[in-house]
């Protein structure tokens, strides 16, 4: 099927590419069908594009890019919602909030997105204990502390 998007224009999406979030995402409970879009120029970032809302797309990344010891404590209920037997069957991503300056880009570690890509199911899992932030700096203090220049690649905002 062809879908019209505000970010990518018209794109072809196969039914077997659609990931269903039965409960939607926090703040977007009505939007339940998404497709993951890769953009090699924006790696390691990925896009989560709504199939039904052409203006709704999120940037996401694997949490271990920023936090090596990121841990989830999933219950059997979470696994059941994703039709998974164990966490190894799942892919984990976190939402990214872009900024004009790379040093200010943040990720939401408190509300990761869990995917069972084989079953095409997704779930936003909210970590209740306050262990993680919704505004964790993606690069931590690496860019500030080492007086490194910001990466020369364009931000996702600039690529549009």
Residue ranges, per PLM feature:
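Long, compositionally biased stretches
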Residues: 2-67, 87-93, 97-160
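Extended catalytic/binding region for NAD+/ADP-ribose chemistry, centered on the ART fold
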Residues: 69-74
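Short active-site loop/helix that positions an aromatic residue
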Residues: 76-86
